[in-house]
Regions:
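Extended active-site and interfacial segments that coordinate phosphate-rich ligands
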Residues: 27-53
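Extended, Lys/Arg-enriched charged tracts that mediate electrostatic binding to polyanionic substrates
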Residues: 1-12, 135
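A generic hydrophobic-helix recognition signal that picks specific residues
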Residues: 13-16, 146
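Extended, well-ordered protein cores
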Residues: 1, 7, 18-29, 39, ...
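Extended, charge-enriched "interface" segments that sit outside catalytic cores
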Residues: 56-174
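Extended, charged helical/alpha-beta scaffold domains that provide interaction surfaces
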Residues: 17-18, 153
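Generic beta-strand/beta-sheet core signal
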Residues: 14, 28-30, 159
Length: 174
Protein backbone atom coordinates (compact mmCIF):
# COMPACT_ATOMS: atom_id res chain seq x y z
CA UNK A 1 0.00 0.00 0.00
CA UNK A 2 0.85 3.62 -0.22
CA UNK A 3 2.13 5.36 2.92
CA UNK A 4 0.66 8.49 4.45
CA UNK A 5 2.11 11.85 3.40
CA UNK A 6 4.91 12.93 5.75
CA UNK A 7 3.01 16.02 6.87
CA UNK A 8 -0.25 14.12 7.42
CA UNK A 9 -2.03 15.06 10.64
CA UNK A 10 -5.42 13.34 10.75
CA UNK A 11 -6.51 14.42 14.22
CA UNK A 12 -5.84 16.73 17.13
CA UNK A 13 -7.04 16.02 20.63
CA UNK A 14 -9.02 18.36 22.83
CA UNK A 15 -10.29 18.25 26.39
CA UNK A 16 -12.49 20.29 28.67
CA UNK A 17 -10.97 18.94 31.93
CA UNK A 18 -9.78 21.93 33.90
CA UNK A 19 -11.58 24.30 31.57
CA UNK A 20 -15.24 23.56 32.33
CA UNK A 21 -16.17 26.79 34.11
CA UNK A 22 -19.76 26.58 32.96
CA UNK A 23 -21.31 26.79 36.39
CA UNK A 24 -18.61 24.76 38.17
CA UNK A 25 -17.23 26.91 41.02
CA UNK A 26 -14.38 24.45 41.60
CA UNK A 27 -12.79 25.14 38.22
CA UNK A 28 -10.79 28.29 38.81
CA UNK A 29 -8.01 29.88 36.78
CA UNK A 30 -5.57 28.15 39.16
CA UNK A 31 -7.10 24.75 38.33
CA UNK A 32 -6.94 25.52 34.60
CA UNK A 33 -3.26 26.50 34.90
CA UNK A 34 -2.43 23.33 36.82
CA UNK A 35 -4.21 21.13 34.28
CA UNK A 36 -2.29 22.77 31.42
CA UNK A 37 1.00 22.39 33.28
CA UNK A 38 0.30 18.73 34.08
CA UNK A 39 -0.42 18.12 30.41
CA UNK A 40 2.80 19.83 29.37
CA UNK A 41 4.69 17.90 32.07
CA UNK A 42 3.42 14.59 30.69
CA UNK A 43 4.09 15.59 27.07
CA UNK A 44 7.66 16.66 27.87
CA UNK A 45 8.25 13.38 29.70
CA UNK A 46 7.00 11.34 26.73
CA UNK A 47 8.92 13.39 24.14
CA UNK A 48 12.09 13.15 26.23
CA UNK A 49 11.80 9.36 26.20
CA UNK A 50 11.33 9.29 22.41
CA UNK A 51 14.21 11.68 21.80
CA UNK A 52 16.50 9.59 24.01
CA UNK A 53 15.58 6.59 21.86
CA UNK A 54 16.46 8.51 18.68
CA UNK A 55 19.74 9.75 20.15
CA UNK A 56 20.74 6.20 21.04
CA UNK A 57 19.84 4.99 17.54
CA UNK A 58 21.38 7.76 15.43
CA UNK A 59 25.09 7.04 15.62
CA UNK A 60 25.74 7.59 11.90
CA UNK A 61 28.19 10.26 10.84
CA UNK A 62 26.96 11.18 7.36
CA UNK A 63 24.74 14.27 7.59
CA UNK A 64 23.69 17.41 5.75
CA UNK A 65 25.88 20.50 5.61
CA UNK A 66 23.31 22.28 7.77
CA UNK A 67 23.68 19.79 10.63
CA UNK A 68 27.44 19.63 10.10
CA UNK A 69 27.62 23.41 10.41
CA UNK A 70 25.61 23.31 13.65
CA UNK A 71 27.50 20.40 15.22
CA UNK A 72 31.05 21.03 14.07
CA UNK A 73 33.23 18.05 13.25
CA UNK A 74 31.33 15.66 15.48
CA UNK A 75 31.55 11.95 14.76
CA UNK A 76 27.92 11.68 15.93
CA UNK A 77 26.25 14.80 14.52
CA UNK A 78 22.65 13.63 14.95
CA UNK A 79 23.22 12.85 18.60
CA UNK A 80 24.88 16.21 19.16
CA UNK A 81 22.10 18.00 17.27
CA UNK A 82 19.21 16.29 19.10
CA UNK A 83 20.59 16.53 22.65
CA UNK A 84 19.61 20.19 23.24
CA UNK A 85 16.01 19.39 22.28
CA UNK A 86 15.99 16.36 24.57
CA UNK A 87 17.54 18.45 27.35
CA UNK A 88 14.83 21.10 26.93
CA UNK A 89 12.20 18.37 27.32
CA UNK A 90 13.95 17.16 30.46
CA UNK A 91 14.19 20.70 31.83
CA UNK A 92 10.51 21.36 31.09
CA UNK A 93 9.48 18.10 32.73
CA UNK A 94 11.57 18.70 35.87
CA UNK A 95 10.76 22.41 36.21
CA UNK A 96 7.01 21.79 36.05
CA UNK A 97 7.36 18.93 38.53
CA UNK A 98 9.20 21.26 40.93
CA UNK A 99 6.48 23.87 40.50
CA UNK A 100 3.70 21.38 41.21
CA UNK A 101 5.40 19.62 44.12
CA UNK A 102 7.40 22.43 45.74
CA UNK A 103 5.75 25.57 44.29
CA UNK A 104 9.15 26.55 42.86
CA UNK A 105 8.62 29.49 40.44
CA UNK A 106 8.62 28.69 36.73
CA UNK A 107 10.69 30.53 34.16
CA UNK A 108 8.33 30.10 31.21
CA UNK A 109 10.96 31.40 28.77
CA UNK A 110 13.08 28.30 29.44
CA UNK A 111 10.20 25.84 29.04
CA UNK A 112 9.01 24.15 25.89
CA UNK A 113 6.44 26.65 24.59
CA UNK A 114 5.38 25.52 21.12
CA UNK A 115 5.18 22.38 19.05
CA UNK A 116 7.29 24.16 16.43
CA UNK A 117 10.19 23.99 18.92
CA UNK A 118 9.92 20.21 18.55
CA UNK A 119 9.12 20.01 14.86
CA UNK A 120 11.74 22.38 13.45
CA UNK A 121 14.82 20.40 14.60
CA UNK A 122 13.13 17.10 13.74
CA UNK A 123 12.47 18.37 10.20
CA UNK A 124 16.14 19.28 9.86
CA UNK A 125 17.13 15.76 10.92
CA UNK A 126 14.61 14.19 8.55
CA UNK A 127 15.80 16.30 5.62
CA UNK A 128 19.41 15.40 6.39
CA UNK A 129 18.64 11.69 6.55
CA UNK A 130 16.73 11.84 3.27
CA UNK A 131 19.53 13.83 1.66
CA UNK A 132 21.97 11.08 2.68
CA UNK A 133 19.96 8.13 1.33
CA UNK A 134 18.56 7.15 4.73
CA UNK A 135 14.86 7.46 3.85
CA UNK A 136 14.00 4.26 5.74
CA UNK A 137 15.45 5.67 8.94
CA UNK A 138 13.75 9.04 8.35
CA UNK A 139 10.41 7.25 7.87
CA UNK A 140 10.63 5.24 11.09
CA UNK A 141 10.70 6.44 14.71
CA UNK A 142 11.56 9.99 13.66
CA UNK A 143 8.48 10.36 11.48
CA UNK A 144 6.35 8.77 14.21
CA UNK A 145 7.62 11.34 16.71
CA UNK A 146 6.95 14.17 14.28
CA UNK A 147 3.38 12.97 13.79
CA UNK A 148 2.88 12.73 17.55
CA UNK A 149 4.18 16.26 18.02
CA UNK A 150 1.81 17.55 15.32
CA UNK A 151 -1.13 15.67 16.81
CA UNK A 152 -0.57 16.25 20.53
CA UNK A 153 1.45 19.47 20.60
CA UNK A 154 3.08 20.47 23.86
CA UNK A 155 0.03 19.84 26.06
CA UNK A 156 -1.22 16.49 24.67
CA UNK A 157 -4.62 18.11 24.04
CA UNK A 158 -6.03 21.56 23.34
CA UNK A 159 -8.00 22.85 26.30
CA UNK A 160 -11.58 23.91 25.64
CA UNK A 161 -12.45 26.56 28.21
CA UNK A 162 -16.17 26.80 28.80
CA UNK A 163 -17.54 29.79 30.66
CA UNK A 164 -21.10 30.36 31.83
CA UNK A 165 -22.61 32.80 29.28
CA UNK A 166 -23.86 35.43 31.75
CA UNK A 167 -20.22 36.25 32.54
CA UNK A 168 -19.60 37.05 28.88
CA UNK A 169 -22.77 39.16 28.71
CA UNK A 170 -21.77 41.02 31.86
CA UNK A 171 -18.32 41.75 30.45
CA UNK A 172 -19.71 42.97 27.12
CA UNK A 173 -22.24 45.22 28.88
CA UNK A 174 -19.51 46.89 30.96
Amino acid sequence: GKGLPKNFNPIEFGSWMGGDRDGNPNVTSKVTKEVLLLSRWEAAKLYEKELTKLIRSYSMRKCSKKIQKLTGKSFEPYRVFLRPLRDKMRFTHRAIEQFIVNKKPLDYKKLLNSKEEILKPLRIVRESLEENQSENIASGDLLDLMRRAKCFGINLAKLDIRQESSRHSQLINE
